Curated annotation (Swiss-Prot):
Similarity field: Belongs to the potyviridae genome polyprotein family.
EC number(s) on file: 2.7.7.48
Coiled coil: none
UniProt-recorded name of the protein: Genome polyprotein
Site (Cleavage): Q21, S22
Biased composition (Basic and acidic residues): 28-46
Amino acid sequence: KYLEVLDFNHIDGCCESVSLQSGKEAVENLDTGKDSKKDTSGKGDKPQNSQTGQGSKEQTKIGTVSKDVNVGSKGKEVPRLQKITKKMNLPTVGGKIILSLDHLLEYKPNQVDLFNTRATKTEFESWYSAVKIEYDLNDEQMGVIMNGFMVWCIDNGTSPDVNGVWVMMDGEEQVEYPLKPIVENAKPTLRQIMHHFSDAAEAYIEMRNSESPYMPRYGLLRNLRDRELARYAFDFYEVTSKTPNRAREAIAQMKAAALAGINSRLFGLDGNISTNSENTERHTARDVNQNMHTLLGMGPPQ
């Protein structure tokens, strides 16, 4: 009987083949009726689903999507308050708020970029370009020069009264550079220019302290005893919101000690002044001094 059923002249593709399904949903390619059911049942729902999908995307972009609430849950959703509302006492002109609240909520610039104690980026670039031209160096050489000048300023400060030369070590040899191009082109001040080097100088001091005890000369003059505060012991350190309270107090005390005893005058002595009045005082040998004629017979004290 088996031989009667078998067709030895069978050719591939000439007959239909039947595949039996195992009942597992994992084999979706063999389910011939599944796709037809999807097509008949979901034809009217496709536009609605696409619209709801677009609406959900728009809601996620706006950020106003509320939380899904279960049908069986009870209670109310906790409201969220806005950071800045129009009910605040905001500046207005003609009854209209002049602030852009949406922009204000996103405007979070770097704090140090707004400090007026730091030279602007344009001023710093102008200073760098002027020093580069007067020293007649390229960018690679200027990188080495800036390293040496930063370390020199850590120990010697950034006073506007500095003059002469600054030195940089090349092994055991001292190399001198004139200070005039650096000081004259520093606008507004040299200290405001050097505030751009604050983080690099702090990291350099930490690196030196990790190898051996290192205290900048500014801290030695102020008699700073805590070596943990050595990283703040230079006069162009930029105090920020991240500066610890103890470090801020030490910086203020060192600055007060550095400024103690300094008497600055707005006007100096004018050398272009001559006295036009004539002195007509007459003195004799019996006068006590040039400002006193006589003591009525009394002699000078013995």
